[in-house]
Regions:
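Structural signature of tandem-repeat unit edges
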Residues: 42-45, 58-80, 90-103, 113-127, ...
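Acidic, Ser/Thr
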Residues: 53-55, 69, 84-86
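Ser/Thr/Gly/Pro-rich low-complexity, disordered linker/stalk segments of secreted
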Residues: 1-25
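A structural signal for leucine-rich repeat
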Residues: 131-135, 154-159
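Consensus positions within tandem repeat domains that build extended binding/scaffold surfaces
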Residues: 83-84, 105-108, 130-132
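Short beta-strand/loop segment at the start of cytosolic alpha/beta domains
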Residues: 18-55
Length: 168
């Protein structure tokens, strides 16, 4: 892999990484852009999972999990968030989850005590892992697509989201 830093993408929705040639399932991709360093794991043909995010600047407070990224000359859909991906993040206050995410791993956002605003754009989430949202701010609001409100409320409650958190 190249040790050169890539230039931030012109489109803030798709951070890029250097072209490293062929990318295989299981391989880890690091993308550094204007929002920080994102680490992804290739999960299938054209799909990746967020492993971790080291945000910088204003992005430390407002974290975005992108719909897709560009890496190795290819566009990848971000379809899942790994277990423990942002567990214990002390600065994150808001989180936006992209429209292609289908799975959120266990403890993904657990103990993010300052997290007050979660926006889920995806209409495809089928799995939210155990304790994924445990111990986020008790005054938090989770905004979900209207058609998925009932389904997501059930999934979020199973994931130990506090009963005090509002689901809109």
């Amino acid at each position: 892999p190249s040790t050169e830093k890539e230039t931030p993408s012109t489109n803030p929705q798709t951070p890029e990484t250097p072209n490293d040639g062929t990318v295989k399932v299981g391989q880890v991709i690091k993308a550094e852009g204007q929002y920080g360093v994102f680490t992804y794991k290739v999960t299938g043909k054209g799909t990746v999972e967020v492993k971790s995010i080291t945000a910088k600047g204003k992005a430390k407070k407002s974290v975005k999990i992108f719909d897709k990224i560009k890496a190795s000359g290819k566009t990848w859909k971000v379809t899942s968030v790994a277990a423990n991906a942002l567990k214990g993040n002390k600065k994150m206050e808001s989180l936006t989850i992209g429209k292609n995410v289908r799975k959120i791993g266990k403890n993904a956002f657990a103990n993010c005590r300052k997290l007050k605003k979660v926006t889920i754009k995806s209409k495809k989430i089928n799995t939210i892992g155990k304790n994924a949202f445990k111990n986020i701010n008790k005054k938090a609001t989770v905004k979900v697509p209207k058609a998925q409100k009932k389904k997501y409320a059930k999934l979020l409650n199973k994931a130990k989201l506090s009963k005090k958190v509002k689901i809109k």
